[in-house]
């Protein structure tokens, strides 16, 4: 009895399928459905401003100076003297700083409103302990240092700003018109610091000008430092009486300006009557990032954004309104971005069938395989046991590593773009510290376009790498199966043994041993020999009987065939008689 058996199963490499496809954009394929995505963008909502995490954040210049504007602090108003804490970040909460108390100031004649913003741009700010000029003995003197009841000191006596000395001629002998006089302003700060020198001039109606200075004509003033020269001419009269912060009404006005002296550099001031000579100066160093915002600062945040307030960074990019931001901030992009985090979407696989020798089923994979929950790439087998699926964790991890690398590359691109294209935003200008919005928007558009292209290329690479992963799986599978299977193409192999779920799991884990699953091969014949009973006959006798019977049968058959042949040719006749 001979029994022929076939034990062929089919094993194929495959990719997972999903019932929830997502869409990503690629550079050349347009929109592609994938099994998973990593959202790269968020749209923030407006919140209160906060302290920047990991840094000291400055709100008011002098938090302990009560009832004082930042301009009061910058001028050194007597009741607004205090320490300005160091800070790496500052909130420009007075977009247009309000007027200072004390004496009425003509803010619009100079850039003095920018002084608080300039000071915010420094990390460390201190007021000098010594005066930069001896006002009493300055050219054109001797002078007395004027004070005003409109600017009371801490004891409520008459006072004036700590940064300026109101130089009033001491006696009638020098209360006369004078030609322009020049005083040198030395650098008294520490090396490496910037020196911010505040100065100004006073003007009033003709009567007061003659009374104070002996000259009723407009006076000329010039300041020069670091190659920047500024000219002013005073305005005589025409001012209505005005009181500041509850002070006494004043018919006169003061004009205040400042100059920035770099380390070791001197400045000059040329003046006539009514000069407000510089006294204590601001010594500043380091850089503090400045952003427009509002007070109070509540809690902490990763990022401070002019439009959204305090933000905690959850994604590398954001959509919505673009504006200046400081800290660990997401980068603005025009449209939402997603990075492929899986494989190209394939509908569940169909097994196409065709009849083969002995009714064997041949099929191949079309689409993706369901059930591969532990990974993206893996193996399938189908045969009498049905369909088994197993994920290859190593291949999946390699794919995940590539996506992680792409994500890290995008993060590096984010940092490089910030440093290269937005670096100028960190170096605040020495004066107004304002940005040209058109240039800033153009910079943001450029960064957004670069990031979007990088994401498209990353998605393209992730999707195209699937072929590499499948080819690697096919090589791995072929090596493990060895001679126990035949390569039939398309990543499929026909085995000479059964391969159920256990077999497939071992293949996926890399522990497969063909010997454990192999059965006799298809080309082996199973022959069952007939058993002979022993009747006391020896082998020779049995062989003799067998040979005689076989020979007699053969001779009889030959004679019968010969007779039939002769009769058919009429060479032999046969008569039957009864």
From Swiss-Prot:
It holds the Pfam family Hemagglutinin. The keyword Lipoprotein applies. A lipid is attached at residues 574, 577 (S-palmitoyl cysteine). GO terms for biological process: endocytosis involved in viral entry into host cell; fusion of virus membrane with host endosome membrane; fusion of virus membrane with host plasma membrane; virion attachment to host cell. It is found in: Virion membrane; Host apical cell membrane. GO terms for molecular function: host cell surface receptor binding. Keywords: Disulfide bond, Fusion of virus membrane with host endosomal membrane, Fusion of virus membrane with host membrane, Glycoprotein, Hemagglutinin, Host cell membrane, Host membrane, Host-virus interaction, Lipoprotein, Membrane, Palmitate, Transmembrane, Transmembrane helix, Viral attachment to host cell, Viral envelope protein, Viral penetration into host cytoplasm, Virion, Virus endocytosis by host, Virus entry into host cell. The record marks 355-356 as: Cleavage. Glycans are attached at residues 33, 67, 153, 174, 312, 341, 500, 526, 539. Disulfide bonds join 12-492, 68-80, 102-151, 499-503. Its main location: virion. Palmitoylated. Residues 1-546 are extracellular. GO terms for cellular component: host cell plasma membrane; membrane; viral envelope; virion membrane. Residues 568-578 are cytoplasmic. It is a single-pass type I membrane protein. Homotrimer of disulfide-linked HA1-HA2. Belongs to the influenza viruses hemagglutinin family. This is Hemagglutinin. It comes from Influenza B virus (strain B/Memphis/6/1986). The gene is HA.
């Amino acid at each position: 009895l001979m029994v022929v058996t076939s034990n062929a199963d089919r094993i194929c490499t495959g990719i997972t399928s999903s019932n929830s496809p997502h869409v990503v954009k690629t550079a050349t394929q347009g929109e592609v459905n994938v099994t998973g995505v990593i959202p790269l963008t968020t749209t923030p909502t407006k919140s209160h401003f906060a302290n920047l995490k990991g840094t000291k954040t400055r709100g008011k210049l002098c938090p302990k100076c009560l009832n004082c504007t930042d301009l009061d602090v910058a001028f050194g108003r007597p009741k607004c003297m205090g320490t300005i804490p160091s800070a790496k970040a500052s909130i420009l909460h007075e977009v247009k700083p309000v007027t200072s108390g004390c004496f009425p100031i003509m803010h619009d004649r100079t850039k003095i409103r920018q002084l608080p913003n300039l000071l915010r741009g420094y990390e460390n700010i201190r007021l000098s302990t010594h005066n930069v000029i001896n006002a009493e003995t300055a050219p054109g003197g001797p002078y007395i240092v004027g004070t005003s009841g409109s600017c009371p000191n801490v004891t409520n006596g008459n006072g004036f700003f700590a940064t300026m000395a109101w130089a009033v001629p001491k006696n009638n002998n020098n209360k006369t018109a004078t030609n322009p006089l020049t005083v040198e302003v030395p650098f008294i700060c520490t090396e490496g610091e910037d020196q911010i020198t505040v100065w100004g001039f006073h003007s009033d109606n003709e009567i007061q000008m003659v009374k104070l200075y002996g000259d009723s004509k407009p006076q000329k003033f010039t300041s020069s430092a670091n190659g920047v020269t500024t000219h002013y001419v005073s305005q005589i009269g025409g001012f209505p009486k005005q009181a500041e912060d509850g002070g006494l009404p004043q018919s006169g006005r003061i004009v205040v300006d400042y100059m920035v002296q770099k380390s070791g550099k001197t400045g000059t001031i040329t003046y006539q009557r009514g000069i407000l000579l510089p006294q204590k100066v601001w010594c500043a160093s380091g850089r503090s990032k400045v952003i427009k915002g509002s007070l109070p600062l509540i809690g902490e945040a990763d990022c401070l954004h002019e439009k959204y307030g305090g933000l905690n960074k959850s994604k590398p990019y954001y959509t919505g309104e673009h504006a200046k931001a400081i800290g660990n901030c997401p980068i603005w992009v025009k449209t939402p971005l997603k990075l492929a985090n899986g494989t190209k979407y394939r509908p569940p696989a169909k097994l196409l069938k065709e009849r083969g020798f002995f009714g064997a089923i041949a099929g191949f994979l079309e689409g993706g395989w369901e059930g591969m929950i532990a990974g993206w790439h893996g193996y399938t087998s189908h045969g009498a046991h049905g369909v088994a699926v197993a994920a290859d964790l190593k291949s999946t991890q390699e794919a995940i590593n590539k996506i992680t690398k792409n994500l890290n590359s995008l993060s590096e691109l984010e940092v490089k773009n910030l440093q290269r294209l937005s670096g100028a935003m960190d170096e605040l200008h020495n004066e107004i510290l304002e940005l040209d919005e058109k240039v800033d928007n153009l910079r943001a558009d450029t960064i957004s376009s670069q990031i979007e292209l990088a994401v498209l290329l990353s998605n393209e690479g992730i999707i195209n790498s699937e072929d590499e992963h499948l080819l690697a799986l096919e090589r791995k599978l072929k090596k493990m199966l060895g001679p126990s299977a035949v390569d039939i193409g398309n990543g499929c192999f026909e085995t000479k043994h059964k391969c159920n779920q256990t077999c497939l799991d071992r293949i996926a884990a890399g522990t497969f041993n063909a010997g454990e699953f192999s059965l006799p091969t298809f080309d082996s014949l199973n022959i069952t020999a007939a058993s002979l009973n022993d009747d006391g006959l020896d082998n020779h006798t049995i062989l003799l009987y067998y040979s005689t019977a076989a020979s007699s049968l053969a001779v009889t058959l030959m004679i019968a065939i010969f007779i039939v042949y002769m009769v058919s040719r009429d060479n032999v006749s046969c008569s039957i008689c009864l």
